[in-house]
Curated annotation (Swiss-Prot):
This is Ribosome-binding factor A. Monomer. Binds 30S ribosomal subunits, but not 50S ribosomal subunits or 70S ribosomes. Pfam families: RBFA. Gene3D superfamilies: 3.30.300.20. The gene is rbfA. It comes from Microcystis aeruginosa (strain NIES-843 / IAM M-2473). One of several proteins that assist in the late maturation steps of the functional core of the 30S ribosomal subunit. Associates with free 30S ribosomal subunits (but not with 30S subunits that are part of 70S ribosomes or polysomes). Required for efficient processing of 16S rRNA. May interact with the 5'-terminal helix region of 16S rRNA. One of its GO terms (molecular function) is ribosomal small subunit binding. It is found in: Cytoplasm. Keywords: Cytoplasm, Ribosome biogenesis.
């Protein structure tokens, strides 16, 4: 088992390398259907499993198509990681959609909606 600092370092290396692969090397047309960015990599403590969280911008059809393309290219990504990062064993790669940005945007929209619907507070109670 690796210590937390090593896990963090390897995780950031994987994030950087996969981001480069998404920009330049993955040739699957489905991956280009939506704009994709790597938001986080969750690496197990034994460095055997990597969950790669991606944010996909586009409509639902483009998101589904992009996720299918990413899942199909997981073997290529794993092989490339094995060549670029010197590890004893290359982790198994799983792509997951990260919808935290959309949830955060929706929460901000709801808070703005509540703020505009609330009547202004009166200071009449302080005058008494």
């Amino acid at each position: 088992m690796a210590n937390d600092r090593r896990v963090s370092r390897v995780s950031s290396l994987i994030k950087r390398e996969v981001s480069q692969m998404l920009l330049m090397e993955i040739k699957d047309d489905r991956v280009g259907a939506g704009m994709v960015s790597v938001t986080d990599v969750d690496l197990s403590h034994d460095l055997q499993h990597a969950k790669i969280f991606v944010s996909i911008y586009g409509n639902e059809d483009a998101k589904a198509e992009t996720m299918a393309g990413l899942k199909a290219s997981a073997g290529f990504v794993r092989r490339e990681l094995g060549q670029r990062i010197r590890l004893r064993r290359t982790p198994e790669v799983v792509f997951l959609e990260d919808s935290s940005l959309e949830r955060g945007d929706r929460m901000l929209h709801l808070l703005d909606h509540i703020k505009t619907d609330r009547p202004p507070e009166d200071d009449d109670s302080e005058e008494e």
